Amino acid sequence: MYINGFIFGKRMGDYYMDDYKDDHKDEYNDESSRHKKPGHDNSKNEQLNKYREKNTGPGEKLTSDAGLKISNDRWSLRAGRRGPTLFQDFHFYKKQSHFNRERIPEKVVHARGDGAYGEFELYKSMRHVTRAHFLQEPGCKTPVFVRFSNFIGSKGSKDTAIDIRGFATKFYTQEGNYDMLALSFAVFSVMDAMKFADFVHAVKPNPRTAVPQATVAHDNAWDYVANNQEIAHFIMWLMSGRGRPRSWRMMEAWPVNTFRFINEHGKSTFVRFVWKPMLGVHSLLLDEANIIGGVDPDYHRRDLHEAIMCGAYPEYELGVQLIQEEDQFKYDFDILDDTKLWPEEVIPVEIIGKMTLNRLVDNHFAEEEQVSFDPATVVPGIDFTNDPVLQGRSFAYRDTDYHRLGTGNINNIPVNQPIVETNLNQRQSDVRHRIDVDSVHYHKNSLAGNTPKETPPEKGGYAHYPEKVDGHKTRERPGESFFDFFSQPRMFWNSMTPVEKQQIVETFNFHLGYVKSKSVRQQVVDMFGNVDTHMATAIAESIGVNPPKESHVPVTKSSPALSQANTAYYPYTQKVAVLIGNGFNGKEVKNVLDYLHHCGVFIDIISENLGTVKGDDGMQIEVNTIFTSTYSVLYDSLYVVGGKTKNEAKFRSDIKSFVKEAYKHYKPIGVATTAASYFNNTNKNNLAGVVFAENNPNFKDEFVSAIAQQRFWNRK
């Protein structure tokens, strides 16, 4: 399958000095290239151009924020050479005062993240169900900004924490901004927004000690789980591979809430959205996620940056699930319950368009940290339902950003600005840049001809769906099926392969092993005995409590769409570590690297020292990194070439360490003819996923096929 927009041969290692040393060599470090790539010229990018400032370069002089040229930015003004600093040193005062105010409050949740710009292209018209302009004409392209994030940890936590991920998208449409706030799980942790603060308090670090960071491996989190059992489905997702994605480019995402589409005739259709990655859905192992968090806490950020700068643009298809108003009560789950998913086998996903991310931010603080997403930022044709979580989310996001960004003028910040004209009477507040020259700023008025005027719905004004609402004030749950906490978690378990089930048990064991309270551990085992008795019994044995007394709920259905075994597999953008020394077979290695390069595989050349390694035919290959600076867990596959180095014993030891860990993690390993000695001859035919080049004319194809498969679970 050809992934549209993928540009092969860009910064995949600069492998051969003689062939590739100058090929796109400077692109990764060239900041201006961020604005010159094909497809980057859209209305949002053009709008941002007027805010971009370059402060360095020939002829640029250092000034104050008032335009004063600075003669000395190194030493403060003192009374005598060894005297005290003088208060009249206004430059030092202003410099330090600004520094003292450079940080803004971090997000309570989703604090750690990163973002990119791109565009969404519609495949097919959705005119029959919605009047939203950007969903009308096939081929319509809409600029977007996407922010990926971790939920639990602080801004400085690790990317690979076992956690739910945020996937928030801002569409800059011709009718104003539309924000779609998605998560990497299809279900949420609470049924009602009232409980969200309690959930966050429980999973955050202990308020007395401020530990642990970015994890639910502590007593408070699991005490909450055991006593708020609506969270069971969410926890099953968290304990699965979905809680540790291989890459932001390889994870699905759902807004989890139920919305309405409204068409031009006023007809309402219930809708849920889903983003599906073109590269398939793939995960790290628990062991990998924990190790990577220590050796490269920026793993997902780095992966996003490298992919975009290489031209391997992340792509996702947008799908919708639609339910007619008259069918909302025909299912065994409530369509307004965010702890329940809509099974794809019951309510099919209709793919309607594709999003491509093709440009990184210019300034992390100005764009990624100041971006604001709000579920209540919608466009005509998209409306709310009585989803209890959505009702709370619809005001909470903007409220928290009023505090975090310190202004009511959030949409004046460039990344948040719509690409259409804005005219409103809410004009003042902190950091107001626009100079409004009107004397009238209220509605209705006669002095300004009652302008700016309202726009009727038939001409593009927003109007809420006229849903009939009646009943008494109550704090009851919306429906009886809200009380069914375990049927869908059981379906999720039934949908997993034996390997996925074992990984879920191991992840439970890892987290519950940190829980000190035996009572809490027992409560959790008893709770998840409702999901699967055998699973809970295996967990109980590991964490030292009794097995559950009750049997699991009698649900036999499954959903194949939930298993990652049924996802797409490609070699594209898989990352291969080439372990190499001097004296390698130049013809063989060049042939293999050329083929990997052609297939879009990312390559790192690893050896004892930086510089170059030389083959038996004189060919030189530039080394990207050294064994001391990298780790096997950072790669999807190994190509073991071997060779000669100055410190032969350490070189062989490093290779064996890489191979041992990659094999332990079920990863594919390609073995060059010069590296056969690293493997026991008697076991070569029994090493699943290990491909040998010796006497193998099909080595290239077999190795690339193994890279695409990614894991070999049948290893002994």
Model-found features: residue ranges?
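Hydrophobic residues within alpha-helices
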Residues: 591-592, 658
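A charged, well-structured terminal subsegment
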Residues: 689-716
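A short, aliphatic-rich alpha-helical micro-motif
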Residues: 632-633
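Surface-exposed, charge/polar-rich loops and edge strands
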Residues: 601, 688-689
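Amphipathic coiled-coil/heptad-repeat helices and related helical stalk/stem segments
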Residues: 589, 654-655
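Active-site-adjacent core segments of small-molecule enzymes
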Residues: 2-583, 590, 597-598, 602, ...
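Catalytic nucleophile loop
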Residues: 517, 637-642, 655-681
